[in-house]
Amino acid sequence: MHISNLLSNKVKYSFAVLLVLLFIPIKSIGQSYLTKSGHVEFDSSVPLHSFTGISDHLVGKIDLQSSLVDFYVDMHTVETGIGKRDRDMLKTLDAETHPFAEFYGKLISDFNPQNNQPQNVTVQGEFTVHGVSNTITIDGTLQKTSDGLRLQANWTLNMKDYNIKPPGILFYRVSEKIDIRISATLPPNTKAK
C-alpha cells in the first residue's frame, strides 16, 4: 500500500506539473502583435487652407516581450483627395528613392496587458522619412482588447528636421509643421517564434 500511495502521489504530482506547464504562457505567443491595415493621417496647411493625407496601409508590430515597436507606411499609399497634390507630395518627399516613413523604437513606459483599459504609453526611437532619421519620443495610448492591442498616437513633425523643403505656390508655402495621427488594431502574431 505504501508503494501504491507513492505512485499515486507521483502521478498526481506529474499531472499537476503538466497542467501548470500547459497554462504558463509561452513567451513568444501572445506577446507579439502585428497589423498590415493601420490608419495614418497627417494634417498640413497653407494660408487660408488645410488638408489631410490618409492611408489605411500602416504596417506595424509591437512585441511586448522585447518592448519593440516598429511601424511603417509606403508614402505611395497616402492620399490627400487631389491627385496633383499627391504627386507633388511624393516628389517633395523623394518617394521614388525613399518610399517609406518608419518609426523603429522601444516602449519605454510600463504597459500592463492584464488591464483592459486604455493606458498612456511612451515610445522612443528613430523616425525616418525622406531618408533622414531623428530620435523622437511619442506619447499615445495602448489598450489590450479581445482582438489584440489597440494603439493611438499623435505627434508633430517639423519638415526642416528631415531636410524637406515645404512646397508652395507663389508666396504661399505649406506649413513646416505636420500633425501626424496613427491608430491601429494589432491582432496577436500567431506566427511569432
Set out the residue ranges of the language-model regions.
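Short regulatory "switch" loops immediately downstream of catalytic or recognition motifs
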Residues: M1-H2, V17, I108-F111
